[in-house]
């Protein structure tokens, strides 16, 4: 049997660089402290054996490279190789390399694919998927805690039967589905057999029904022939009467034409005058608008001039203040220059005096060379004797110099502070002047602002009042327009409606008595509930304009085109062709004629209303409307109260979403008064709009007031800032500087006292040093003729010090005056720049004021000219209005003449209308009868034409499409008039009936007979007339279903066979593993327990298909009774889990077994038993590589591999190997030592 010989690792996890681990003995233990990298060694073995990355405790392959988890990878690659040794064969090397983000596999240094790599390992008994070669840390406890289902999953994984689970489920579903299909086709076949029997019975019933139906058809033909015959007789009679009346009307028309021509000429003249009047009104509006635009420009120009004048006054004051300040600053600078000249003069006089004194000195203490040498020697000797005193004096000198520097610094600071106080006083003076100037500007601005606010208030009140009134007018106009027009129309629609109303008023004024108005304005539903229904029936004709004649209609159309108005529909009363109202329809229950629920005024517009409504019926609900429309022998046009319309042709249209809004237009009352009110409100709106146009002037004033207010606000803010910030800050800084200046005196005095005190101490030291010098220089002083050596030394130095001190005083004075002079020069330049700037500002403002005054005069002149032009236009408008009124009076007289002639014509037209109505009704009746015959498939005997010549369009739908609809219906009637019916089949007795009562009686008799036959037919349940076709269809379906059933049965058999095959293969795999483990587990458990009384056994919950349910595992510990696995102690559970683990390994065992801390949960007794068992098995069955932390365990091994950590950026694992075979097991129980 082969074994794992060596492991070579390079940069894998905690193993940095290349390390060779091994050789591995048959029983090798891996030891080391926690965190040293023991488990990483097990991960390396798992890695080289093809384990997935997710099981190696990392997310990506790159994380396996040493240092990668902390962002410092040791290299860009890592590898692990394994040397596998087998008796009688050459060693083989298996390697896995991390290159980039992927793995590379090698066998004996040859790169191979993963599947080849896996196959070679499987040949050695190493199953990568089953992981039969290793046990991870904690796996023993996990196995001990598994429930039966989890144990089944473990066996599925080991036996690889789980690989077939997906295919097993798929085949099972296919088998179940095939069986269901078979069952379904069986029931379907059974049902179709029943249908075949039923179809035979239906065919017999259909034959009997057809015979009765033929008898009914013959009765229907007889009834329809009777109705049509008498209808044609009546139509011929009415046509003769109508021709006579039309001749009389033609004569009256010629008389009216002459009057109409005269009226037309007057209308043209009036139209021209009104256009001229409108043009003048347009020009007045334009001039008024122009004037409103010019006024704000004039106001703005005037305001700009006023503002610039105020600005100039402020600039002049600023110039005066700047000049005054400049003169004062110039005087201060002159004083400083005089003082500077005075100091320079005093310095020169001092220098001249010193020069004279130097020349006038007689005595000169000059030593000979030997005396100089002697002086230096004696000086050195004196220094040595007084060294201690000299050092002490030197220390005093250093301290004295430091204090003198402090004194000079304080005095310099005092001078600077005095200069700063002087500067602050000047700044305070400037602040106070600025405050005075700002207060003066604020007072002036407030006065201007009050004036602007007053003007703004007046304009605001005027504009707001105009706005409020405009809102009120608009609300009233909206209410009027809502009543006059559609409630949902938007502003554009309101404007459009207003335009249409204006045109309507114009044509009524131009054609009085000829133009009656819109249909909606001339009629009203009798009750509110009929509003929607009437709206639906009238449709587009609601807004149609009713005129007396076609000629008037064409004149109106021409006028509308000239005015560029929208297209309108006209209904000329002399042109419309209407059918008479069918009186029988008034007898129908649950329905009323639409024309009967409408009130109309004047009466002579009835023809237009008849044209729009036809014989339409209104019903309370949709069900009644549908029943009446299609339920009887004759179809009718009906409408429900909710607006649902049923056409004779079968078309049904529901109530549109805007139908209710349109229907609300019927609620308007006193339309004429509302129109007058609308005109009045429109005129008032124009006047108020003129006032509202002052809003531009108001905005200009508001803008100026806002600008002035903002300037005032900024000035007040500047004043407040100057007072509370600049002035207060300067005063505060001045006080602070004065306080500092007051503190300089005591500090300077303190320093002077310290210096004076130290001078006394230095004087005492000096006297002691002088005593030493006097002793040393006593003889030398006698030689040169001085009292002491200091007299000789000071004679030269004293004079020089006095001169230097005086010169320093002069330099300090010059420096101080120079600094002040430079400061004053800079301030003087700033003052001079301010004077220049204000001079330029004054000059610029004066030029701008001159320009602004000219601009103001120009605007005033334009306003005066515009006002004059406006007044001239108003005068023209009044004159033109008077001319229009005169022309209207002339036209009124002509219209009166035309009205008289029109009355005579109206009387004749009424008679014609009555005849035409009856004639139209008869034609409509004939059309409806023919249409009903065609719809009901009643074959009439025709001598000319065919049934296809009968139109299916509705005969009474004239109201739907205005004049074009009327022409269409007339063409239908004309086409149907060409159809000649053969009345040969009609009994002569029926033809001879003349009186209306006699005709009605005969018709009722025929109808009653037909009703009885239809009643018999209706009592018979309508059979399936296609029974024969159904019978043939059912026979075909039966054969088809039989074939499908047989095919489904074969598919089910095939699916079952496929399922049984995969089921057997899965069972064989699982059972082979299970039987092997179940056979070996008892023996292994006895060996682990070291007791033959121990028992372990496995049992499947489902013996037929064990992989579908759990596997029970029970053990009886030595010397104990049977207890469930959960009741075993921790050690007993671990031993039982190990027994199961080793038993599973015995099925297709791998050549080596890697275990990670399997002894973790074992006590000392069980550790020894498990270690001995592994040791025994490693000699013959498998190689064991165990990670352990317990000495009782790893001392049983043949070799040890020690892992220890080294610290770096991350843990670095190092390895030691130790061969225990060289050391016999002298103490098998280490605990006794």
Curated annotation (Swiss-Prot):
GO cellular component: chromosome; chromosome, centromeric region; cohesin complex; condensed nuclear chromosome; cytosol; kinetochore; meiotic cohesin complex; mitotic cohesin complex
Binding annotation for ATP: 32-39
Methyltransferase is among the record's keywords: no
Stretches for region Disordered: 284-308, 348-369, 947-966
Entry keyword Secreted: no
Reported disease: Cornelia de Lange syndrome 2: A form of Cornelia de Lange syndrome, a clinically heterogeneous developmental disorder associated with malformations affecting multiple systems. Characterized by facial dysmorphisms, abnormal hands and feet, growth delay, cognitive retardation, hirsutism, gastroesophageal dysfunction and cardiac, ophthalmologic and genitourinary anomalies.
Domain notes: The flexible SMC hinge domain, which separates the large intramolecular coiled coil regions, allows the heterotypic interaction with the corresponding domain of SMC3, forming a V-shaped heterodimer. The two heads of the heterodimer are then connected by different ends of the cleavable RAD21 protein, forming a ring structure.
Other observations noted: Mutated Cornelia de Lange cell lines display genomic instability and sensitivity to ionizing radiation and interstrand cross-linking agents.
Family per record: Belongs to the SMC family. SMC1 subfamily.
Protein name (Swiss-Prot/TrEMBL): Structural maintenance of chromosomes protein 1A
Organism (species): Homo sapiens (Human)
Gene name tied to this protein: SMC1A
């Amino acid at each position: 049997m082969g074994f794992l010989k060596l492991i070579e690792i390079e940069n894998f996890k905690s193993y940095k660089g290349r390390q060779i681990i091994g050789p591995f003995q048959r029983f090798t233990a891996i030891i080391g402290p926690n965190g040293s990298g023991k488990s990483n060694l097990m991960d390396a073995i798992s890695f080289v054996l093809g384990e997935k990355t997710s099981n190696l405790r990392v997310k990506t392959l790159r994380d396996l490279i040493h240092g990668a988890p902390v962002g410092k990878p040791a290299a860009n690659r890592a590898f692990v190789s394994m040397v596998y040794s087998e008796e009688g064969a050459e060693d083989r090397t298996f390697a896995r390399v991390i290159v980039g983000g992927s793995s590379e596999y090698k066998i004996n240094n040859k790169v191979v694919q993963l599947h080849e790599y896996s196959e070679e390992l499987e040949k050695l008994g190493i199953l990568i998927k089953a992981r039969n070669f290793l046990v991870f840390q904690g796996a023993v406890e996990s196995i001990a805690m598994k429930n039966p289902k989890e144990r089944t999953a473990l066996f599925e994984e080991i036996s690889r039967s789980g690989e077939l689970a997906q295919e097993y489920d798929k085949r099972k579903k296919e088998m179940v589905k095939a069986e269901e299909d078979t069952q379904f086709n069986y029931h379907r076949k059974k049902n179709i057999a029943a249908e075949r029997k039923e179809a035979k019975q239906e065919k017999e019933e259909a034959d009997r029904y057809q015979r009765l139906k033929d008898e009914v058809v013959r009765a229907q033909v007889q009834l329809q022939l009777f109705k049509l015959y008498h209808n044609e007789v009546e139509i011929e009679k009415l046509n003769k009467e109508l021709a006579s009346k039309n001749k009389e009307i033609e004569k009256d028309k010629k008389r009216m034409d002459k009057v109409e021509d005269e009226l037309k000429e007057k209308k043209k003249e009036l139209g021209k005058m009104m256009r001229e009047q409108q043009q003048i009104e347009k020009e007045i509006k334009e001039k008024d608008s122009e004037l409103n635009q010019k006024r704000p420009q004039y106001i703005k120009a005037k305001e700009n001039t006023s503002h610039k004048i105020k600005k100039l006054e402020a600039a002049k004051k600023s110039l005066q203040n700047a000049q005054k300040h400049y003169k004062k600053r110039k005087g201060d600078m002159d004083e400083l220059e005089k003082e500077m000249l005075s100091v320079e003069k005093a310095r020169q006089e001092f220098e001249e005096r010193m020069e004279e004194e130097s020349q006038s000195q007689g005595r000169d203490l000059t030593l000979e060379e030997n005396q100089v040498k002697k002086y230096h020697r004696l000086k050195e000797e004196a220094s040595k004797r007084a060294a201690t005193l000299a050092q002490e004096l030197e220390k005093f000198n250093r301290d004295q110099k430091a204090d003198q520097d402090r004194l000079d610094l304080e005095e310099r600071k005092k001078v600077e502070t005095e200069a700063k106080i002087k500067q602050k006083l000047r700044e305070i003076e400037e602040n106070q002047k600025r405050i005075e100037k700002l207060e003066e500007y604020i007072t002036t601005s407030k006065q201007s602002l009050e004036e602007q606010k007053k003007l703004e208030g007046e304009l605001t009140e005027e504009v707001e009042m105009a706005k409020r009134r405009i809102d009120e007018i608009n609300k009233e106009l909206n209410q009027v327009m809502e009543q006059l027009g559609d409630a949902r129309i938007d502003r554009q629609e309101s404007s459009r409606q207003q335009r249409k109303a204006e045109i309507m008023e114009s044509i009524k004024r131009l054609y009085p008595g000829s133009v009656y108005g819109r249909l909606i304005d001339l009629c009203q539903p009798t009750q509110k509930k009929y509003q929607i229904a009437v709206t639906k029936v009238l449709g587009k004709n609601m807004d149609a304009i009713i005129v007396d004649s076609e000629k008037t209609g064409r004149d109106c159309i021409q006028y509308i085109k000239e005015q560029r108005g929208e297209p309108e529909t006209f209904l000329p009363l002399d042109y419309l062709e209407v059918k008479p109202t069918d009186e029988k329809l008034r007898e129908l229950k649950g329905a009323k004629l639409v024309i009967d629920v409408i009130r109309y005024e004047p009466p002579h517009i009835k023809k237009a209303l008849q044209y729009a409504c036809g014989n339409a019926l209104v019903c309370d609900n949709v069900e009644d409307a549908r029943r009446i429309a299609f339920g009887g022998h004759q179809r009718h046009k009906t409408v429900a109260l909710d607006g649902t319309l049923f056409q004779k042709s079968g078309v049904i249209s529901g109530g549109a979403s805007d139908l209710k809004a349109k229907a609300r237009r019927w609620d308007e009352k006193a339309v004429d008064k509302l129109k007058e009110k609308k005109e009045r409100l429109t005129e008032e709106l124009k006047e108020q709009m003129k006032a509202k146009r002052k809003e531009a002037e108001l905005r200009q004033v508001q803008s100026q007031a806002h600008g002035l207010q903002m300037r005032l606000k900024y000035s007040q803010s500047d004043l407040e800032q100057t007072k509370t910030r600049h002035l207060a800050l300067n005063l505060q800084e001045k006080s602070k500087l004065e306080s500092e200046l007051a503190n300089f005196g005591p500090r300077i005095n303190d320093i002077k006292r310290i210096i004076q005190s130290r001078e006394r101490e230095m004087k005492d030291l000096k006297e002691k040093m002088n005593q030493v010098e006097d002793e040393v220089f006593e003889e030398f002083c006698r030689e040169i003729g001085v009292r002491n050596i200091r007299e000789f030394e000071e004679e030269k130095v004293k004079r020089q010090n006095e001169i230097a001190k005086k010169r320093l005083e002069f330099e300090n004075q010059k420096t101080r005056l120079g600094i002040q002079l430079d400061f004053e020069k800079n301030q003087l330049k700033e003052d001079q720049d301010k004077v220049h700037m204000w001079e330029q500002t004054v000059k610029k403002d004066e030029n701008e004021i001159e320009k602004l005054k000219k601009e103001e005069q120009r605007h005033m002149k334009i306003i005066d000219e515009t006002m004059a032009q406006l007044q001239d236009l108003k005068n023209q408008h009044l004159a033109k209005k008077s001319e229009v009124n005169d022309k209207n009076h002339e036209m009124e007289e002509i219209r009166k003449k035309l009205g008289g002639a029109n009355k005579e014509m109206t009387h004749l037209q009424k008679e014609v209308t009555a005849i035409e109505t009856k004639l139209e009704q008869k034609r409509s009746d004939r059309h409806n009868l023919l249409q009903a015959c065609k719809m009901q498939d009643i074959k009439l005997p025709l001598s000319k034409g065919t049934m296809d010549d009968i139109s299916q369009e509705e005969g009474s739908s004239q109201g739907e499409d205005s004049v074009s609809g009327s022409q269409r219906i007339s063409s239908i009637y004309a086409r149907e008039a060409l159809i000649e019916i053969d009345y040969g089949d009609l009994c002569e007795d029926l033809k001879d009936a003349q009186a209306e009562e006699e005709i009605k009686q005969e018709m009722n008799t025929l109808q009653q007979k037909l009703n009885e036959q239809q009643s018999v037919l209706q009592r018979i349940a309508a059979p399936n007339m296609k029974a024969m076709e159904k019978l043939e269809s059912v026979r075909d379906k039966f054969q088809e279903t039989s074939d499908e059933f047989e095919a489904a049965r074969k598919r089910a058999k095939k699916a079952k066979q496929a399922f049984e095959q995969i089921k057997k293969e899965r069972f064989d795999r699982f059972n082979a593993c299970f039987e092997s483990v179940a056979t070996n587990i008892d023996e292994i458990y006895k060996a682990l327990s070291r007791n033959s009384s121990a028992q372990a056994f496995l049992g499947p919950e489902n013996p037929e298909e064990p992989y579908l349910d759990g596997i029970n595992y029970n053990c009886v510990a030595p010397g104990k009774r049977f207890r469930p696995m959960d009741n075993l102690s921790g050690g007993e559970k671990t031993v039982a889990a190990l027994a199961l683990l080793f038993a599973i390994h015995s099925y297709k065992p791998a050549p080596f077994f890697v275990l990670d801390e399997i002894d973790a949960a074992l006590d000392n007794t069980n550790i020894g038993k498990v270690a001995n068992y592994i040791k025994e098995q490693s000699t013959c069955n498998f190689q064991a590589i165990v990670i352990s932390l317990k000495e009782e365990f790893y001392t049983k091994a043949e070799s040890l591999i020690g892992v220890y950590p080294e610290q770096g950026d991350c843990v670095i694992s190092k390895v030691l190997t130790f061969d225990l075979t060289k050391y016999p097991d002298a103490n098998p129980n280490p605990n006794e030592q």
